[in-house]
Amino acid sequence: THLLTKKDIVYRCNAADIKMIVCAGESVITDHITAAMPESPSVKRLVSVGPEVPEGFEDFHKGIEAAAPFVKPEHPNTNDDISLMYFTSGTTGEPKMVAHDFTYPLGHIVTGSFWHNLKESSLHLTIADTGWGKAVWGKLYGQWIGGANVFVYDHEKFTPAAILEKIQDYHVTSLCA
């Protein structure tokens, strides 16, 4: 997320023993990451998905083009392995790391099917920055598992009138904000 500062990145990298950062290639993000690296010894690789690929970052798209064909590992992941980690908002101190296993997405079938009342014909929009857990549980797992279409609106600044215009123009049928 573009909201993390150098301090936030250092804390999270060290708390989670992060090995690689994959990020949008925008200076508001990459400058903070670059500044955090001297205090983030576990990080070995930086990858930018563009549009810019700063010095010290690998180009995600070139990496995909040069990648060898996928080979299934001898020992694939199990449902109990860590799939995803969130950090809490830190309202009562430093953010706390919360790990989820590979069964976590299944819990959000209920979110998409019953809370959002989604069908295969639904077009769903969740308003949340990808740095927040809501971005995952509110617009990916239960929604896609349930077969709904997910509307993505990448906006620089939250502007209610622009959101309402997108909802109207694209006939969004479900909203979570």
Model regions and ranges:
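Structural core segment of the AMP-binding/adenylate-forming
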Residues: 1-62, 176
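Short loop/turn segments at beta->alpha junctions
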Residues: 5-8, 101, 159
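Short hydrophobic/charged patches on amphipathic alpha-helices used for structural packing
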Residues: 10, 74, 161-164
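Adenylate-forming
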Residues: 12, 63-64, 88, 105
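Conserved S/T- and glycine-rich ATP-binding loop of Class I adenylate-forming
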Residues: 21, 82, 88-91, 124, ...
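Conserved pre-ATP/AMP-binding loop-to-beta segment of ANL
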Residues: 48-58, 65-87, 94, 117-123
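Conserved AMP-binding A3 loop
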Residues: 83-107
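Conserved AMP-binding/adenylation subdomain of ANL enzymes
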Residues: 106-126, 130-174
